[in-house]
Amino acid sequence: MRGMRFARPARIAAAGAALAATVSLLSTPQAGAAPICPDAGRAPVLVGRAPGAAIEGAAVDGAGRLYVTDLRSNRVLRIDRPGAPAVPFATVPGPMGGGLAFAPDGGLLVGYGDARVFVGDVARPAGIVKIDVGTGAVAPFASGLSAANGLAVTRDGTVYATNDLASLVGRVLPNGVVQPDWAVLPSANGAALSADDRYLYVSRTFVNPGVSRIPLANPAAPESLVDFGGADMFVAPDGLVLDALGRPIVPTDISGEILRVDGHNRYCALAGGLQGSSVLTFGSGGSGFSAGRLFRAGFDGDIYEIGA
């Protein structure tokens, strides 16, 4: 995985064994390669670059500006439009967790502090800060979480936070109460909410790789949508999104595919050849990284537009 050697050490250690096992698998033409989606669009187009960054999280504001988290510098970077330079926007305290999401009031939520993700379920060292996108001011938002690799926010302001290297999924209520053990799902990574706020969708990166959804009303009963097996066992799904039809679209760290889930254990590739893909985000607004467009960012610091 390009760029991974400088990224979060704990994650590299976990990914190392999977990557080594994958080398022989990927040497065969069909290994780890999903069928191409019949409606896949054009080939990926490079639209941005953050030189030297290892991007873990990405989100677009209403003005079409792209924000990304850099695991190497603990900074949030901003790219105002495709082709524009990535500029430092804010620095978070402690090690970068990577998750990014917008609160209902427009503030940018950023996960931090999960350098000890393997023991995060016990130590709960992670938290979330809130950034004013107008001024760049950083303020505390929540603490006491296992990790915050993925963040998702409901319409009422409830925040969900995942940990790709442990098991706890945390919840922060609108009144500020933190529930670090709201759900248990090993290696839950990324976070995306259904349009009706009934389900939290997550990738399972390192343990039983696949995609699950967790009913918000019954977090003890997660449902598996995809179980990657065979040659696909080592694809390492990461920060996913849902399309307009509610279908999960998942980037893969190792195989470099952008996969769309069309049904139970049915998936196809919208794009390939993008090793180190860590996160997807849809655009917003009428200009810049605009609404209706899908963007991929990765540990290589590159941002691509994906035909979807």
Cite the ranges covered by each PLM segment.
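Beta-propeller domains
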Residues: 68-91
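Glycine/small-residue-rich hydrophobic helix-like segments
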Residues: 209-274
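Secretory targeting and sorting signals
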Residues: 1-33
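A short loop-to-beta-strand structural motif that recurs across blades of beta-propeller domains
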Residues: 75-78, 126-129, 168-171, 210-212, ...
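A short beta-strand motif characteristic of beta-propeller blades
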Residues: 42-49, 84-91, 136-142, 177-183, ...
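Short loop/turn segments that connect beta-strands within beta-propeller blades
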Residues: 79-84, 131-136, 172-177, 215-220, ...
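Blade/loop signatures of beta-propeller domains
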Residues: 32-41, 73
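Beta-rich, blade/repeat-based domains predominating
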Residues: 48-65, 92-117, 125, 142-160, ...
